[in-house]
Amino acid sequence: MVHAVIPENRDQYRDALLQMHRDRKTIFVDRLHWAVPVVDGEFEIDQFDTEQAVYLLALDPRSHRHLGSVRLLPTLHPHLLGDVFPDLCAAGVPRDAGTWEITRLCTTPGLEKAEARAVLGLIATALVEFALLYGVYRYTCVAHLQWLSQLIAVGWDTEPLGAPQQIDDELVGALSINVTPATLQM
């Protein structure tokens, strides 16, 4: 089951959020070698993990263990694309109340491939449901070209925001994803 962690219920998910930050450190720092902040040697927490951030957490229904997650940021507040990678957008960074950014999508290290795919599917559905419930009509994201290709392959209505650029020996691009009720059927 996927839980939407919003400012009003964040205290109820304290343990799950710590697990998420621990898993993010394992994936993004230990495996992918990203130069991002690490708190207390075990938690990947950056400047965008603020009160405005919303987290969609896939949790094991019995143990409530973190299985996967994504961070959502309203683009009217500081966010990765707008504050770190604005050059990835040819016509400027999209910023409005109905545009949110997807960042830090991950699954728990050690999941079998089939289970990780299932968790990502649950998170994808939750992204669309969250958008429809909260008036989000567009998501933006920054990702390595391989991830962007996988997002496009899902069949969602996507648009590149600019040409991919070489950043730290990787091709990185920005993408927008238009969300409508029909997106749930994809």
Language-model segments: residues:
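Acyl-donor binding region in acyl/amide transferases
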Residues: L80, P86-V172, I177-P181
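Short, His- and charge-rich active-site/binding loops that engage polyanionic ligands
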Residues: L59-G92
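A short helix-loop-beta-strand connector motif used in the catalytic cores of GNAT acetyltransferases and
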Residues: Q47-L57, L80
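Short, solvent-exposed loop/turn elements at beta->coil junctions and helix N-caps
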Residues: D40-Q47, G162-Q165
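C-terminal catalytic domain of photolyase/cryptochrome flavoproteins
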Residues: A182-M186
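Short connector loops at helix/strand junctions that flank enzyme active sites
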Residues: E51-A53, L67, R95-W100
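Short, hydrophobic/aromatic-rich beta-strand segments within well-structured domains
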Residues: L56-A58, R71, L127-V128, T140
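Short amphipathic alpha-helix that is part of the acyltransferase structural core
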Residues: M1-E44, L57-R62, H66
